[in-house]
């Protein structure tokens, strides 16, 4: 699965009868949804971008100077003048120079002098700013079912589907082939202040240099460089790249301050680099909160017969995935398609299956299958696939796993924020409380009661509530009632 290859992975486990789960997706992360009686699904935020954003200012990094002219007057002869002074795109400077008999003046003193130079911008020496429009930013969400096929990190799963969202998008339904349909309703949120963000892009001149950065609007507008708006042929403040020398009689030198690319690159050190792909300008941060509908998902292969246990061989022996799960792959030499008999037992309990399958109902197909992912309790375990067996020690502790999943649940609820609550009606408010409980405690509940059936969990919740009602000690009564209520809420809830 896609999530197996990513470091930032989260699990959301639906309770009995789950039809909807709420996910928080961020760039670089991936969420695996597991629910009883449903295929597992990976969901991730693949990209945030805008196509062809609007240009704001263009800056010139290297001036192109031509047609230098100088005019001078003797003392008392009035100001020197050039017609170029009134022309757009020309830089001029007035000054006073020493005049006398040696440079063709009858009087000694200060005479007027003016120098002008035509200024443009060198080719491929511009820095352009682009602004985002929040209404046009596209959020790409991808969905991939766990099919039992091993897919390398650099390969694309044939069952992968894509949904795109903007601020005005409605619910999207994706068809996952034999696994049914999944619906997505996502609320989008950028991770940056778009009103204060500019993408600064340089003309491409060197392959080893980055070409775009994500900068603050005020910093961009304060750049001391010649600038213009798109479509305007003339540059403003072009004198910032031109220097005039000291006047000498009838001569005034004009200097080009040179290429400012190096100065700009030095100023951009440490600034986030922006990614541009064709006409797509990508944002580096942001998230979407998605409500995923699972009601039309269906398990594949439930009617298959069980595979012959003696005809399996390891293709990839069990390996730690890095996400507190174990992954493996087997080959099968018997009749296909069929269901893979897989289980795991803990040390000292040979009759209890402790494996929680992330790949539900693993199968061998005519053209693939055999990849299995499972979660095991900490400690010594034995994994069985048919007649194959493998000793496995799962690191960590049950308590640590509970705290970790609870922490992630709190993070998810924090990111969802105000959208997690509905104060419009009493029913909506209590539904919001239930959803919040599932979001925060769903992972911990599954870690503790993952191998317990629906009826035992229901009876346990009722028993704890009954004890709470019949206990005289107020503290113990409240503790039993609270614990029993949580167990019943997590067991009977239909949302996560």
Swiss-Prot record:
<dbReference type="Pfam" id="PF00869">
    <property type="entry name" value="Flavi_glycoprot"/>
</dbReference>
<keyword id="KW-1170">Fusion of virus membrane with host endosomal membrane</keyword>
<keyword id="KW-1090">Inhibition of host innate immune response by virus</keyword>
<feature type="region of interest" description="Fusion peptide">
    <location>
        <begin position="98"/>
        <end position="111"/>
    </location>
</feature>
<keyword id="KW-0165">Cleavage on pair of basic residues</keyword>
<keyword id="KW-1043">Host membrane</keyword>
<keyword id="KW-1161">Viral attachment to host cell</keyword>
<keyword id="KW-1015">Disulfide bond</keyword>
<dbReference type="InterPro" id="IPR011998">
    <property type="entry name" value="Flavi_Glycoprot_E_cen/dimer"/>
</dbReference>
<dbReference type="Pfam" id="PF02832">
    <property type="entry name" value="Flavi_glycop_C"/>
</dbReference>
<protein>
    <recommendedName>
        <fullName>Genome polyprotein</fullName>
    </recommendedName>
</protein>
<feature type="transmembrane region" description="Helical">
    <location>
        <begin position="448"/>
        <end position="468"/>
    </location>
</feature>
<keyword id="KW-1038">Host endoplasmic reticulum</keyword>
<dbReference type="GO" id="GO:0039654">
    <property type="term" value="P:fusion of virus membrane with host endosome membrane"/>
</dbReference>
<keyword id="KW-0899">Viral immunoevasion</keyword>
<dbReference type="GO" id="GO:0019062">
    <property type="term" value="P:virion attachment to host cell"/>
</dbReference>
<feature type="disulfide bond">
    <location>
        <begin position="60"/>
        <end position="121"/>
    </location>
</feature>
<feature type="disulfide bond">
    <location>
        <begin position="307"/>
        <end position="338"/>
    </location>
</feature>
<feature type="glycosylation site" description="N-linked (GlcNAc...) asparagine; by host">
    <location>
        <position position="154"/>
    </location>
</feature>
<feature type="disulfide bond">
    <location>
        <begin position="92"/>
        <end position="116"/>
    </location>
</feature>
<keyword id="KW-0472">Membrane</keyword>
<feature type="transmembrane region" description="Helical">
    <location>
        <begin position="480"/>
        <end position="496"/>
    </location>
</feature>
<dbReference type="InterPro" id="IPR027287">
    <property type="entry name" value="Flavi_E_Ig-like"/>
</dbReference>
<dbReference type="GO" id="GO:0016020">
    <property type="term" value="C:membrane"/>
</dbReference>
<dbReference type="InterPro" id="IPR000336">
    <property type="entry name" value="Flavivir/Alphavir_Ig-like_sf"/>
</dbReference>
<feature type="disulfide bond">
    <location>
        <begin position="3"/>
        <end position="30"/>
    </location>
</feature>
<keyword id="KW-1133">Transmembrane helix</keyword>
<feature type="disulfide bond">
    <location>
        <begin position="60"/>
        <end position="116"/>
    </location>
</feature>
<feature type="disulfide bond">
    <location>
        <begin position="186"/>
        <end position="290"/>
    </location>
</feature>
<keyword id="KW-0862">Zinc</keyword>
<dbReference type="InterPro" id="IPR013756">
    <property type="entry name" value="GlyE_cen_dom_subdom2"/>
</dbReference>
<feature type="topological domain" description="Extracellular">
    <location>
        <begin position="1"/>
        <end position="447"/>
    </location>
</feature>
<dbReference type="Pfam" id="PF21659">
    <property type="entry name" value="Flavi_E_stem"/>
</dbReference>
<keyword id="KW-0325">Glycoprotein</keyword>
<keyword id="KW-0941">Suppressor of RNA silencing</keyword>
<dbReference type="InterPro" id="IPR038345">
    <property type="entry name" value="Flavi_E_Stem/Anchor_dom_sf"/>
</dbReference>
<keyword id="KW-0812">Transmembrane</keyword>
<keyword id="KW-1168">Fusion of virus membrane with host membrane</keyword>
<dbReference type="InterPro" id="IPR036253">
    <property type="entry name" value="Glycoprot_cen/dimer_sf"/>
</dbReference>
<dbReference type="InterPro" id="IPR014756">
    <property type="entry name" value="Ig_E-set"/>
</dbReference>
<keyword id="KW-1162">Viral penetration into host cytoplasm</keyword>
<dbReference type="GO" id="GO:0044167">
    <property type="term" value="C:host cell endoplasmic reticulum membrane"/>
</dbReference>
């Amino acid at each position: 699965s896609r999530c197996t290859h990513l470091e930032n992975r989260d699990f959301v486990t639906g309770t009995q009868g789950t039809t909807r789960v709420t996910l928080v997706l961020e760039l670089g992360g991936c969420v695996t949804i597991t629910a009883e009686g449903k295929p597992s699904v990976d969901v991730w935020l693949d990209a945030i971008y805008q196509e062809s954003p609007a240009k704001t200012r263009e800056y010139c990094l290297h001036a192109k100077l031509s047609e230098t002219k100088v005019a001078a007057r003797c003392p008392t002869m009035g100001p020197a003048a050039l017609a170029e002074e009134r022309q757009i795109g020309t830089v001029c400077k007035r000054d006073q120079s020493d005049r006398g008999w040696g440079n063709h003046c009858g009087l000694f003193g200060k005479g007027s002098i003016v120098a002008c130079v035509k200024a443009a911008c060198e080719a491929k020496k511009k820095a352009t700013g682009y602004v985002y429009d929040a209404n046009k930013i596209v959020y790409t969400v991808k969905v991939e079912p766990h099919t039992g096929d091993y897919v390398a990190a650099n390969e694309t799963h044939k069952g992968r589907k894509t949904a795109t969202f903007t601020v005005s998008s409605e619910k999207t339904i994706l068809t996952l082939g034999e696994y049914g349909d999944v619906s997505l309703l996502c609320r989008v949120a950028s991770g940056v202040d778009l009103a204060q963000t500019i993408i600064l892009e340089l003309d491409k001149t060197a392959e080893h240099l980055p070409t775009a950065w994500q900068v603050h609007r005020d910093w961009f507008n304060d750049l001391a460089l010649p600038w213009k708006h798109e479509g305007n042929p003339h540059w403003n403040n072009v004198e910032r790249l031109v220097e005039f020398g000291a006047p000498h009689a009838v001569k005034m030198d004009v200097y080009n301050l040179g290429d400012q690319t190096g100065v700009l690159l030095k100023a951009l050190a440490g600034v986030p680099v922006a990614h541009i792909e064709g006409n797509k300008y990508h944002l580096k941060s942001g998230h979407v909160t998605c409500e995923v509908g699972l009601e039309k998902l269906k398990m594949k292969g439930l009617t298959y017969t069980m595979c012959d246990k003696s005809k399996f061989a390891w293709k990839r022996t069990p390996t730690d995935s890095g996400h507190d799960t174990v992954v493996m792959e087997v080959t099968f030499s018997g009749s296909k398609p069929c269901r893979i008999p897989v289980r795991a037992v803990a040390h000292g309990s040979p009759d209890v299956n402790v494996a929680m399958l992330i790949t539900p109902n693993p199968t061998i197909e005519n053209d693939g299958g055999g990849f299995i992912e499972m979660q095991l309790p900490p400690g010594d375990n034995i994994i069985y696939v048919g007649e194959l067996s493998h000793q496995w020690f799962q690191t960590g502790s049950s308590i640590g796993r509970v705290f970790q999943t609870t922490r992630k649940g709190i993070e998810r609820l924090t990111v969802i924020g105000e959208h997690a609550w509905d104060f419009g009606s009493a029913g909506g408010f209590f539904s919001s409380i239930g959803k919040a409980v599932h979001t925060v405690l769903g992972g911990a509940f599954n870690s503790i009661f993952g191998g317990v059936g629906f009826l035992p969990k229901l009876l346990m919740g009722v028993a704890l509530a009954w004890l709470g009602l019949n206990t005289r000690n107020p503290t113990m009564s409240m503790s039993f009632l609270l614990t029993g209520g949580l167990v019943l809420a997590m067991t009977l809830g239909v949302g996560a």
